[in-house]
């Protein structure tokens, strides 16, 4: 009985993590879409959006700063370099 309850708790944890992962993916997709498509967006606004997205991601996954820096930071940097012709 105790093992069954622990298994249910593990399933619940996995479901919650899956929801947070999906929320992060949707949020980052939206941020990257706005940065790439909004013609009125300034480089400062884009940088602020990227910083806010990082803070939000780390609030969802506090212990995953390295993962964020490896996965999303290069994508955002590349996007901003292409969009604003930064070097």
Feature locations, PLM:
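General helical secondary-structure elements
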Residues: 1, 15-19, 50, 79
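Eukaryotic N-terminal intrinsically disordered, low-complexity segments enriched in Ser/Pro
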Residues: 1-6, 44, 66
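N-terminal acidic leader/helix
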Residues: 6-43
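Helix-centric, low-specificity signal for extended rod-like, repetitive segments
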Residues: 13-16, 47, 68, 76
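Helix-rich interaction surfaces within compact, conserved domain-sized segments
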Residues: 52, 56-87
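Short linear, low-complexity motifs centered on an aromatic residue
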Residues: 42-56
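Short acidic DE-rich linear segments
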Residues: 3-9, 85-87
């Amino acid at each position: 009985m105790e093992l069954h309850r622990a298994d249910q708790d593990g399933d619940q944890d996995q479901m919650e993590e899956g929801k947070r992962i999906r929320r992060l993916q949707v949020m980052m997709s939206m941020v990257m879409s706005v940065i790439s498509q909004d013609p009125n967006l300034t480089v400062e606004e884009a940088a602020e959006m990227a910083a806010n997205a990082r803070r939000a991601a780390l609030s969802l996954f506090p212990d995953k700063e390295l993962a964020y820096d490896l996965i999303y930071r290069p994508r955002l940097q590349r996007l901003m370099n292409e969009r604003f012709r930064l070097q």
